[in-house]
Design a protein with these regions (language model features):
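Long amphipathic alpha-helical segments used for membrane anchoring, targeting, substrate engagement
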Residues: 2-19, 288-447
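Alpha-helical transmembrane segments of polytopic integral membrane proteins
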Residues: 184, 188, 197, 342-345
């Protein structure tokens, strides 16, 4: 995410490395490079110029403490201004009515239908709401079927009328359905449209007028950069939407849309799509995004994702098993499945400060976890509980059953054994024993 921009900004800050103090000359040189980096990232020209002018003004107006290096100060100012540029703080959905209505709008191919499903799951699992999906794309039958499949997958009800061709009537009927069945939120999925298509723009304006939505969200593909910003401007002039959702942000190496859209249309980015999984929808936090752009990671979001998958009762049960040295492949599989639910591995690793840069050019393949799962699921229940019984013939059978090699099975067994030993070491008094064996620690045996 934003890898190219992060790399360019890091190079820009190096101009100030070795400088004893901030001067107008070295600030101008640094910010010239920063502006070029922003423009290459497809940031709006006026936004880039205003941004660097503000940073320059703040940098030259600072009394730098002797303990603070000029490059460190510049990073701090750029970080704060990036967060301000993207909106300073997250903005919640305002869902005041019952049922509340959320209207989705955007171009064809922006990911509105998938986003509608993700948002329904988000509201259901994280906001304890009872959403109803309304299929109002009357031009593309495949969109209705796609929404139906997603609704079934996330176990959320859907309202659709294949005979009706007027999206206004479908949306109003969905709201009546929600009232009758006590659903508190209606998510209206509409057809994609171009801002220059007068008939379709009039149509969605009519849907908005008829349904009086609590939230109108403009859904846009982050990877389209400046085009996303220009389209947002056109849609906003017609719809006066309440917020933006950037989809496919995990594939955006530049960041032009995320950095420009708030300043150009004066509407907040409320959510970002960060992957193909239905859980891959995050509330947009400008300060955390600024952290990631500057290579500082995003520990808070990482912890939040982990907490969402955390089950206190299961954790206590696992701790007892570890202390009794009973950690088995069933537990190992459960831990892997929790990690998978948190998101793709490369994205999770990038949230750890310094790691994102280190693995930028490394191909991290999430399908490797599927191979591990296949091996474990090819074991019998007894073998999962008692991996010590896995002899050569059993390993051969497991390899054939999982489509892997015996070497793959042996590699997993070795990793499992190391994991079990480490878990045993850090549970109870094991941590103290492990520390005592480290060089320089009390209890370290002398040579």
């Amino acid at each position: 995410m934003f890898d190219n921009l992060s790399e360019r900004l890091e190079r820009s800050f190096k101009i100030l490395k070795g400088e004893g103090k901030i001067t107008e000359i070295n600030v101008a040189e640094t910010l010239k490079d920063v502006r070029r980096a922003l423009l290459d990232a497809d940031v709006n020209y006026k936004v880039a110029k205003t941004f660097t002018d503000t940073v320059k003004q703040k940098a030259l107006g600072q009394n730098v403490l002797t303990a603070v290096k000029p490059s460190q100060l510049m990073v701090k100012i750029v970080h704060d201004e990036l967060a301000t540029l993207m909106g300073s703080e997250s903005v919640d959905l305002k869902l005041e009515h019952r049922p509340s209505v959320i209207l989705m709008a955007g171009l064809n191919g922006a990911g509105k239908t998938t986003l509608a499903g993700k948002l329904a799951l988000f509201l259901k699992t994280k906001k304890n709401r009872r959403p109803l999906l309304a299929a109002c794309d009357t031009y593309r039958p495949a969109a209705i079927e796609q929404l139906r499949v997603l609704a079934e997958q996330i176990k959320v009800p859907i309202f659709m009328n294949l005979e009706e061709k007027d999206p206004v009537k479908i949306a109003l009927a969905a709201i009546q359905e929600a009232k009758a069945k006590s659903y508190d939120t209606v998510i209206v999925d509409t057809a994609g449209r171009l801002a220059i298509d007068e008939a379709l723009m009039n149509e969605i304006a009519a849907v908005k007028a008829a349904t009086s939505p609590d939230e109108t969200l403009f859904v846009v593909d982050a990877m389209t950069g400046q085009d996303a910003v220009n389209t947002a401007k056109e849609f906003n002039s017609r719809l006066d939407f309440d917020g933006v959702v950037l989809t496919k942000l995990d594939g955006d190496t530049r960041g032009g849309a995320a950095l420009s859209i708030r300043a150009v249309v004066d509407k907040p980015i409320k959510f970002v799509g960060t992957g193909e999984k239905m859980e891959a929808l995050d509330v947009f936090h400008p300060d955390r995004m600024a952290d990631r752009i500057l290579g500082m990671g995003d520990i808070i979001s990482l912890v939040e994702r982990a907490q969402e998958q955390y089950d206190e009762a299961e954790a206590r049960k696992l701790q007892r098993k570890i202390q009794k040295n009973q950690f088995d492949f069933n537990d190992f599989l459960a831990q892997l499945q929790q990690i998978k639910k948190m998101g793709n591995i490369k994205d999770l690793a990038a949230m750890i400060p310094g790691v994102g840069k280190a693995i930028k050019d490394v191909d991290v393949d999430d399908s490797a976890l599927l191979g591990v799962e296949a091996i474990i699921l090819s074991m019998t229940p007894y073998e999962r509980r008692h991996p010590e019984v896995l002899n050569a013939s059993r390993k051969t059978r497991i390899a054939k059953g999982s489509g892997k090699t015996v070497q793959d099975v042996n590699r997993l067994l070795k990793q499992f054994d190391q994991t079990r030993k480490m878990m045993k070491m850090v549970s109870g008094n094991g941590l103290r024993q492990m520390m005592s064996r480290m060089p320089g620690m009390p209890g370290m045996p002398k040579a």
